[in-house]
Amino acid sequence: MAVDNKKRDSCSVTMKERFVRTTYAAVAEDRFGMRIAINIEGEEAMVKIAVDAMGGDNAPGEIVAGAVMAAQSREDIQIFLIGKEEVVSEELKKHTYKKEQIEVVNATEVIETEEPPVNAIRTKKDSSIVVGMNMVRRGEADAFCSAGSSGAILVGGQVIVGRIKGVERPPLAPLIPTEKGVSLLIDCGANVDARPSHLVQFAKMGSIYMEHVVGIKNPRVAIVNIGAEEEKGNALVKETFPLLKECKDINFIGSIEAREIPHGGADVIVSEAFVGNVILKLYEGVGATLISMVKQGMMTSLRSKIGALLVKPALKTTLKAFDASQYGGAPLLGLKGLVVKTHGNSKRIEVCNSILQCVTFKEQAINEKIKESL
């Protein structure tokens, strides 16, 4: 059964196509400790994405459907669907796709959200998360994408894939919608006990992301605070502010209050994970509530229904900005390989966009640029 064309069109495809199929002789590490594949044919490689088919509330159905959408939208990617082979293969039968683009990799275990992440990573060696991250570690995949356990992904990213030399803490960095487009919120859940030096690195990595992935030249960097004045804030913010001010690698504009974030007051919004996660969850909740309230309001009377028809095109565009599925997942920056965490309730469009997001990271050599900046 082919994927619905309307749904397929909703999956963003904006990256330049330039990777082709090849084979590798070996996997080595560059001078920064980054794992690289050695090409024996002299050609560029297809981008290979390992996808956790068993992670998330809607697995495996929506995960498999999203992977198929991504493969249908680009011919230069190869997707490894990792999970219980018989279950994933059965889902694949529902779709039309090129067999050479999607391969099922068997993994007999699943890490559940409620499991202690450290113990799960150590004991469930044949889980979809561990198998996928090991593929990245060995250079068999360029990126790993999962809607599964956040804790397991954070632990596995550091323990299995490993940090780039010089990176103190890898942050989670999702894009959030604003009046002016999008901003990067960094960190939103990985490091609740961050130090000033960590936040400075977050600012540098976030600037690289926004310049090379989103295309914003000299992105504005701000730190989340309770006021615009330099002397305001808790101890962490007060200690970090002068360090960011002195950093010549970023365009630091000072503090940003939460109310300024939706207006696009900065391109890179720096915070420790507790504050960042509260902002992200509030953002998602308010967005979902607004969409629901607007839809309900349009159906209260005949007059409102007629008015809704008149404003429908503009309203649809506006409300779409609050749809998290349009922005893909949150990369765990600063690792030796690409790891992207998608929402636990992700459906096919968000899965598709997260996979294509991995392609952009690879094409723009984000990890290499991060290494060079440290």
PLM region descriptions:
Residues 29-45:
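Short, Lys/Arg-enriched N-terminal segments with co-localized hydrophobic residues
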Residues 59-63, 126-139, 143-157, 164, ...:
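Short glycine/serine/threonine-rich phosphate/pyrophosphate-binding segments
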Residues 61, 78-80, 86, 192-258, ...:
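Glycine-rich phosphate/diphosphate-binding loop of Rossmann-like nucleotide-binding domains
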Residues 45-89:
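N-terminal phosphate-binding or glycine-rich loops at protein starts, especially the Walker A/P-loop
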Residues 51-61, 190-200, 341-346:
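Short, glycine-rich nucleotide/cofactor-binding loops
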Residues 97-141:
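Phosphate/nucleotide-donor binding subsite
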Residues 158-171, 175-185, 265-269, 273-374:
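Glycine-rich phosphate/nucleotide-binding loop
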